[in-house]
UniProtKB/Swiss-Prot annotation:
The keyword Repeat does not apply. InterPro entries: FAM110 (IPR025740), FAM110_C (IPR025741), FAM110_N (IPR025739). The modification Phosphoserine is found at S234, S297. This is Protein FAM110B. The keyword Transmembrane helix does not apply. Coiled coil: none annotated. It is found in: Cytoplasm; Cytoplasm, Cytoskeleton, Microtubule organizing center, Centrosome. Belongs to the FAM110 family. It comes from Rattus norvegicus. Transmembrane segments: none annotated.
Length: 366
């Protein structure tokens, strides 16, 4: 072995395991002890909210000492105070009520409970109206009628509707019925009172429909039947009604000159197509007018059926008054000539004959 390797081997010292551990882990962590690791395992302490941090730093951005010393308390929802209830009312409200059989009147305890509830609601309304008395409305001076049971009201109204009040003999039946309906309306308006859960919804029902009383007395003569409205209308009223209603827009009307111009153009086009087969005047001069003599004799005498005549025929067919009338109208009609299909076939045949004559003339000249 060379001597250099022996020297280097003697210089290297063996490393103990304790030395490796101490070099890898710093001594300051080992000296802290187990409490240090326990504190890290625990959850973080409670953090301050933004309001608390601003409260702590208030002296930095607030100048007045009063604001610095004052503390802002959180806003709490307003709690509605319950109305005071007397001990007698508590006992009445807490006492059990008897069951009602057959929907008859309530027991005395139930009636007292309803009256006490109504008094409590009236006290609440009076107190709220007393605070707003500066507006000029004196609502607290109202005297609310006592609340009645619904079954009692129905029985009362039904009994009153059956009653017929005596009227003097000279009075007309219309006056007696009006008196009865007026009395019933006043009593029903006074008796009805709508009470809801909220104090502001308590109101007196005044919009009650008037009750129609049926007169039961045999002495009163029967009412005459009402005359029909259609018979009462006069011709003057018929003239006034269209003026009051919405006026109709006049339909579009063309002038006579425009219509005559249109009809003239249509007649010229029809004459040119059917009489001269739609040919231009130059072509007609080349072919010769004598060739159109037969076509004119066949076509000029035809009666063309317009759209207006077709619509009038449809209207006449819809009229189903009598068979004789339809037969007379059918006899009065002017007999038409050949059909449009046959007329077109003749024109096509005649044009084909002209074409053949042209070709034969060309062949003869060649």
């Amino acid at each position: 072995m060379p001597t250099e390797t022996l020297q280097t081997g003697s210089m290297v010292k063996p490393v103990s395991p304790a030395g490796t551990f101490t070099s890898a882990v710093p001594l300051r962590i080992l000296n802290k002890g187990p409490d240090y690791f326990r504190r890290q395992a625990e959850p973080n302490p409670k953090r301050l909210s933004a309001v608390e941090r601003l409260e702590a730093d208030k002296a930095k951005y607030v100048k007045s000492q009063e604001v610095i010393n004052a503390k802002q308390e959180p806003v709490k929802p307003a709690v509605l105070a319950k109305p005071p209830v007397c001990p007698g009312a508590k006992r009445v409200l807490g006492s059990p009520t008897l069951k009602v059989f057959g929907n008859h009147a309530k027991t005395e305890s139930g009636v007292q409970r309803e009256t006490l509830k109504l008094e409590i609601l009236k006290n609440i309304i009076n107190s709220s109206e007393g605070s707003s008395s500066g507006s000029g409305h004196k609502h607290s001076s109202r005297n609310w009628p006592p609340h009645r049971d619904t079954t009692e009201l129905h029985r009362h109204s039904f009994a009153e509707s059956l009653k017929v009040y005596p009227t003097p003999g000279r009075g007309s039946p219309q006056e007696s019925s009006s008196h009865v309906s007026r009395r019933l309306l006043e009593q029903s308006a006074e008796s009805f009172l709508h009470v809801s859960h909220s104090s502001s919804d308590i109101r007196k029902v005044t919009s009650v429909k008037p009750l129609k009383a049926i007169p039961c007395s045999s002495s009163a003569p029967p009412l005459p039947p009402k005359p029909k409205v259609a018979a009462m209308k006069s011709p003057d009223a018929d003239q006034v009604e269209p003026a009051c209603g919405v006026s109709r827009r006049p339909s579009l009307q063309r002038s006579k000159s425009d219509l005559s111009d249109r009809y003239f153009r249509v007649d010229a086009d029809v004459e040119r197509f059917f009489n001269y087969c739609g040919l231009d005047p130059e072509e007609l001069e080349n072919l010769g007018m004598e060739n159109f003599a037969r076509a004119n004799s066949d076509i000029i005498s035809l009666n063309f059926r317009s759209a207006s005549m077709i619509s009038s025929d449809c209207e006449q067919s819809q009229d189903s008054n009598s068979d004789l009338r339809n037969d007379d109208s059918a006899n009065d009609r002017v007999p038409y000539g050949i059909s449009a299909i046959e007329r077109n076939a003749r024109i096509i045949k005649w044009l084909y004959s002209i074409k053949q004559a042209r070709e034969s003339q060309k062949v003869s000249h060649v």
